[in-house]
Amino acid sequence: ISSQVRHIDFMPTILDMLDIKINDSFEKLDGESLLPLLNGEHREEKFAFSETGNPLNKNAPPKIPNTKSIRNSKWKLIHNEYNDTMEFYDLENDPNEENNLIGKNLEEEKKFLDELLKYTNN
């Protein structure tokens, strides 16, 4: 698989490979099976969301504030809650994340911010 995948896709993939169906009364899994991708099919890339304890303040407990990010294979948006800063990177042209593009009025920035808010407001 050459496209970005998410760790939440592993369980649905394994269940799909083993032909194990999820009971409809169970809560829906967040991920999706990667089996179609393994079989050469194409699917639209999904956003990958991550959240980690606060790496910017070593004295703060690891609960909150956190650092949250959302990405696809081209772009990555990071929100540092500790100091309420944002970072936005073009991963294709800046894989080391050295050129923060936040506030450069890129159309993608708003799209990613909206997606991040969807994840964090659920």
Where do the protein language model's features map onto the residues?
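Intrinsically disordered, low-complexity polar regions and short flexible loop motifs
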Residues: D94
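Carboxylate-dense, calcium-coordinating segments in secreted/extracellular and ER-lumen proteins
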Residues: E97-L101
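C-terminal cap/loop subdomain of S1 sulfatases and analogous C-terminal strand-loop tails that border
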Residues: S3, I8-M11, D16-L91, E108, ...
